[in-house]
Amino acid sequence: MGIRKYKPTSPGRRGGSVSTFAEITRSKPEKSLVRPLHSKGGRNGHGRITARHQGGGHKRAYRLIDFRRHDKDGIPAKVAHIEYDPNRTARIALLHYVDGEKRYILAPVGLKQGDRVENGPAADIKPGNCLPLRNIPTGTFVHAVELKPGGGAKLGRAAGAAIQLLAKEGAYATLRMPSGEMRQVEVACRATVGQVGNVEHANISWGKAGRMRWKGKRPSVRGVAMNPIDHPHGGGEGRTSGGRHPVSPWGKAEGRTRKKGKPSDRLIVRRRSKKKR
């Protein structure tokens, strides 16, 4: 994948960039693997906003991605196409299995049209092949990792994501996540070899707010810019929060929301590294 910079023909174009989509081999998805996706606009069943800053955006169709692949052990497949998916940052690959079935998977770096893909413990260590962690050599970079055996891929699904298998000891394997976190998962969990494709996605400059609106993201307004009726930080002369600690629009203290003592905490060897400011 490459990135093409826009010419500064307008203020919105200046500084903006876009993917070249050079790896895409087909523009229309496989009809049998597409489902309708209804836009909720951040509303619940009563029509009230429960998730702010959502709404609008281009109409999308949902592509069914195979995150399990357990039922295709020993059945090889050929990569028919590399396609764009509007619902995720990664590209997707359409597989044609020898038994006649078609399925989508996340397209890793190096996977191209015509390649052979396998599933199961006996699969080779090649990008796109899915097998249990116990059958993958330590030091290998993987993606689409399960948290529970048979539960489907949960970790390492975004564009450019790569999880390194550091060690295997007993029933658990130690992984280093893209965030720097080190955690353990069962060696029976499956993972796909390689790094997720579309690596340059993180370097795209959106250029203007309108491109975020196309993605269905609405503006996020600061509390200090609101009136007192709208937010606890609102009102006052100038940018003042009234001396109180940051709170949500409903008065709840901002900050950590993760449950303390979550059962899976015991599997986290080292917390994620803090971002450099």
Swiss-Prot record:
<feature type="compositionally biased region" description="Basic residues">
    <location>
        <begin position="37"/>
        <end position="55"/>
    </location>
</feature>
<comment type="subunit">
    <text>Part of the 50S ribosomal subunit. Forms a bridge to the 30S subunit in the 70S ribosome.</text>
</comment>
<keyword id="KW-0694">RNA-binding</keyword>
<keyword id="KW-0687">Ribonucleoprotein</keyword>
<dbReference type="InterPro" id="IPR022669">
    <property type="entry name" value="Ribosomal_uL2_C"/>
</dbReference>
<dbReference type="GO" id="GO:0003735">
    <property type="term" value="F:structural constituent of ribosome"/>
</dbReference>
<dbReference type="InterPro" id="IPR014722">
    <property type="entry name" value="Rib_uL2_dom2"/>
</dbReference>
<feature type="region of interest" description="Disordered">
    <location>
        <begin position="217"/>
        <end position="277"/>
    </location>
</feature>
<dbReference type="GO" id="GO:0019843">
    <property type="term" value="F:rRNA binding"/>
</dbReference>
<dbReference type="InterPro" id="IPR022666">
    <property type="entry name" value="Ribosomal_uL2_RNA-bd_dom"/>
</dbReference>
<comment type="function">
    <text>One of the primary rRNA binding proteins. Required for association of the 30S and 50S subunits to form the 70S ribosome, for tRNA binding and peptide bond formation. It has been suggested to have peptidyltransferase activity; this is somewhat controversial. Makes several contacts with the 16S rRNA in the 70S ribosome.</text>
</comment>
<comment type="similarity">
    <text>Belongs to the universal ribosomal protein uL2 family.</text>
</comment>
<feature type="region of interest" description="Disordered">
    <location>
        <begin position="1"/>
        <end position="55"/>
    </location>
</feature>
<protein>
    <recommendedName>
        <fullName>Large ribosomal subunit protein uL2</fullName>
    </recommendedName>
</protein>
<dbReference type="GO" id="GO:0015934">
    <property type="term" value="C:large ribosomal subunit"/>
</dbReference>
<dbReference type="InterPro" id="IPR012340">
    <property type="entry name" value="NA-bd_OB-fold"/>
</dbReference>
<dbReference type="Pfam" id="PF00181">
    <property type="entry name" value="Ribosomal_L2"/>
</dbReference>
<dbReference type="InterPro" id="IPR022671">
    <property type="entry name" value="Ribosomal_uL2_CS"/>
</dbReference>
<dbReference type="Pfam" id="PF03947">
    <property type="entry name" value="Ribosomal_L2_C"/>
</dbReference>
<keyword id="KW-0689">Ribosomal protein</keyword>
<dbReference type="GO" id="GO:0016740">
    <property type="term" value="F:transferase activity"/>
</dbReference>
<keyword id="KW-0699">rRNA-binding</keyword>
<dbReference type="InterPro" id="IPR002171">
    <property type="entry name" value="Ribosomal_uL2"/>
</dbReference>
<dbReference type="InterPro" id="IPR008991">
    <property type="entry name" value="Translation_prot_SH3-like_sf"/>
</dbReference>
<dbReference type="GO" id="GO:0002181">
    <property type="term" value="P:cytoplasmic translation"/>
</dbReference>
<dbReference type="InterPro" id="IPR005880">
    <property type="entry name" value="Ribosomal_uL2_bac/org-type"/>
</dbReference>
<dbReference type="InterPro" id="IPR014726">
    <property type="entry name" value="Ribosomal_uL2_dom3"/>
</dbReference>
